[in-house]
Regions:
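Vicinal oxygen chelate
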Residues: 13-15, 76-117
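Conserved beta-strand in the GNAT
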Residues: 57-62, 112, 121-122
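Core segments of cupin and vicinal oxygen chelate
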Residues: 11-56, 94, 107
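Short, glycine-anchored, charge-dense loop/turn motifs used at functional sites
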Residues: 22, 117-121
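Short, charged, intrinsically disordered terminal tails
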Residues: 107, 122, 126-129
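N-terminal beta-strand motif that seeds the catalytic metal site of vicinal oxygen chelate
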Residues: 1-19, 74, 127-129
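Active-site beta-strand termini and strand-to-loop segments that position acidic
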Residues: 41-45, 113-116, 126
Length: 129
């Protein structure tokens, strides 16, 4: 027996705002919003598939009073699906991301960005559909 990765919970100051940002990044949509907690996921699986409903993993944003103070110990890597890395970085910066320095050197193939609340993530060079 094993476990499946189904959801990533993210503490934040503005669950709705951060959920909107990540929906734009990933092409996700809001699945549930209740009492300061917002869950987003991929669009529903079309009818006739084996498991109708959101395709995991989902992201759940929960309001917490304290802010982020240190570098993430866990982060997301995203892959552009229909454009080159530099084009995707420009798109994400336009959505509200910013460049982040986590000690990376100039000779790495990924770009480190932070979401509007400072959570670091990487944009990889490889395109994956």
């Amino acid at each position: 027996m094993t476990s499946k990765f189904t959801d990533l919970a993210i503490d934040c100051a503005d669950p709705s705002g951060l959920a909107r940002f990540w929906c734009s990044v990933l092409g996700y949509e809001v699945q549930d919003e209740d009492g300061g907690v917002v869950t987003i996921g991929s669009p529903m699986v079309p009818e006739g598939k084996n498991h109708p409903g959101p395709v995991p993993p989902t992201l759940t944003f929960a309001h917490v009073p304290e802010g982020k103070t240190v570098k993430n110990r866990l982060h997301l890597d995203v892959n552009p699906t229909d454009r080159e890395q530099d084009e995707e970085v420009r798109r994400l910066l336009g959505l509200g991301a910013r460049h982040a320095d986590v000690g990376q050197t100039g000779d790495v193939s990924w770009v480190v960005l932070a979401d509007p609340e400072g959570n670091e993530f990487c944009v990889l060079a490889a395109r994956r559909p």
